Regions:
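The feature captures the beta-strand-to-loop junction immediately N-terminal to the Walker
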Residues: 37-39
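ABC ATPase nucleotide-binding domains
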Residues: 33, 74-231
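Helix-to-loop junction immediately C-terminal to a conserved catalytic motif
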Residues: 52
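Conserved ABC transporter NBD signature motif
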Residues: 60-68
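Non-catalytic connector elements of ABC transporters
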Residues: 239-244, 250-362
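ABC ATPase nucleotide-binding domain
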Residues: 7, 27, 63, 340-342
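Pre-Walker A (P-loop) beta-loop-beta motif of ABC nucleotide-binding domains
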Residues: 24-35
Length: 362
């Protein structure tokens, strides 16, 4: 199997007067599984289509395996794309759907049979080869679409929201199958999604995009644990990170975040790293906020969401702000209860009025 790096060097794209990608640079290493994650309209699918050759590049260069390809047609780039819609030929068997692209480029019958046999084994669809798409479930059709890419032996796989049409249970199963497929093939893979769970569980690195630019590139736990911006902190994680307006008190060189009611959250963020002036917000994830009798932060429970192994508590603080705390196991807390909260300040982040994040030293 071919495995190639992909390099984007100051790539730009315009639709009329609207710039949708602006001088974006990124290196995807050979064998990496990269997720492009972001909301609708952020440019992630456009960027994928530029790599595939389905959209032109208005500036910069794209290189695959060290070779510049942005001037080449899609078929000459050595990539295989799997779309949200399966795009299978309904009148053909699964075998013929898998073979179609290979026949068009003159691949021998023996080689076609060998590749299809191998792809069918990996994807566990050998028993489906004589069926037509109408006889398959949604998950089976998606595996056939992936198989059609697999038999091409490409330099890289490009997935454009391939799980969006599947129901929740099937989406989980197919996600596991994709992870297993990458472990077996170690193929360079780009996966476009708006679903943070797909990105977090599948990718070795995530490219978080917003408003046609890259907000952050990092491993899933870097993105989750040390978000570069407020957008990333809000977009990744469920429930979203809590944000509360604060003033800062110096605590031996570290920042204590003072809330509106005078209570404090002692962070490990260095005071000298913070900007002078401007508004600041403390950001804390729900799992770092606990109901405890000795907690420093008082509040009233408004909504209780019981999720089985954990409970999310929506709490209004005495200064009027709200947050979500997580209670492990079967919580005894009820709506209307007054509680006290303890916050793990070591995991807290601070954000300035431009949305930039400040973290504890590593």
């Amino acid at each position: 199997m071919q495995v190639s790096s992909i390099e984007l060097d100051s790539v730009s794209k315009r639709f009329g007067s609207v710039e949708v990608i602006s001088e974006l640079s990124l290196t995807i290493h050979s064998g990496e599984f990269i997720a492009f994650l972001g909301p609708s309209g952020c440019g992630k699918s456009t960027l994928l289509r530029m790599i595939a050759g389905l959209e032109s590049v208005d500036g910069g260069e794209i290189r695959i395996g060290g070779e510049r390809v942005d001037h080449l047609p899609p078929g000459a780039r050595g990539v295989a794309m799997v779309f949200q819609h399966y795009a299978l030929y309904p009148h053909m068997t699964v075998f013929d759907n898998l073979a179609f692209g290979l026949k068009n480029i003159g691949t021998s019958q023996d080689e076609i049979a060998r590749r299809i046999e191998e792809a069918a084994r990996i994807l566990e669809i050998s028993h489906l080869l004589k069926r037509k798409p109408g006889q398959l479930s949604g998950g089976q059709r998606q595996r056939v679409a992936i198989g059609r890419a697999l038999v091409k032996d490409p330099k890289a796989y490009l997935f454009d929201e391939p799980l969006s049409n599947l129901d929740a249970a099937l989406r989980v199963r197919t996600r596991v199958e994709l992870a297993r497929l990458h472990q077996q093939t170690r193929a360079t893979t780009i996966f476009v999604t708006h679903d943070q769970v797909e990105a977090m569980t599948l990718a070795s690195r995530i490219v978080v995009m917003n408003a046609r630019k890259v907000e952050q590139v990092g491993t899933p736990m870097e993105i989750y644990g040390r978000p570069a911006t407020e957008f990333v902190a809000r977009f990744v994680g469920s429930p979203a990170m809590n944000f509360l307006p604060v003033s800062i008190r110096d605590r031996g060189g570290l920042a204590s975040a003072v809330l509106g009611d005078g209570s404090t959250i002692d962070t490990d963020v260095p005071v000298n790293a913070l900007p002078a002036g401007g508004e600041l917000r403390v950001g804390v994830r729900a799992e770092a906020i606990h109901v405890r009798p000795d907690g420093a932060l008082p509040g009233k429970v408004e909504v209780v969401e019981r999720l089985g192994d954990r409970t999310h508590l929506h709490i209004r603080l005495t200064d009027g702000n709200t947050l979500v705390a997580e209670d492990k196991g079967v919580s005894q807390v009820q709506p209307g209860d007054t509680v006290r909260l303890a916050v793990e300040g070591a995991t807290a982040h601070l954000f300035d009025d431009a949305g930039l994040a400040y973290h504890a030293r590593q």
